[in-house]
Amino acid sequence: MPFDTDTDIEFTKGTLRHSEYHKILSKHFKVIVSHIFTGQDIFQYEPKEEYDCIVSNPPFRGKSKIVSRVLEFNKPFMLLQPFAIFNDRNPIGLISDQGKQVQILKFNQRAKFIKPSGLIEQKVTFQSGYISTGILENDFIVENLVMPTPKDIREYNKKIERE
């Protein structure tokens, strides 16, 4: 799994937080981690170790460049993206132009994100999910998210602010 770290680097407070990708996937798979902040930029880096697929939360900007680069690896992939990606023919077109089937993992509600400050974003104004090739059992899946309550988010954010 290139393009993630085993710890998320949180710069504003200088703390390290464990990556959710790494924590979950490493329970079942050997995970290769990489990240731009550790000198492994997706546009110049490919792991030397053998790997089977790419699971990543890439930047939401430069979607076409990211999809194009991931396609160069010729591996199944799963990328977290805002669904505004479907407003632009290019990123999705790049996948279908290579004869690959676009797969979608959508959530029943908007996901919450942790901001660089470590706080949970309370109001997310866009829908996001995963675009994928060759990973999902079905081409379109809707997954139910279990979300923290507003009270849980407030308590978590207060705890982070005190740290």
Features from the language model and the residues they span:
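Class I S-adenosyl-L-methionine-dependent methyltransferase catalytic core
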Residues: M1-E163
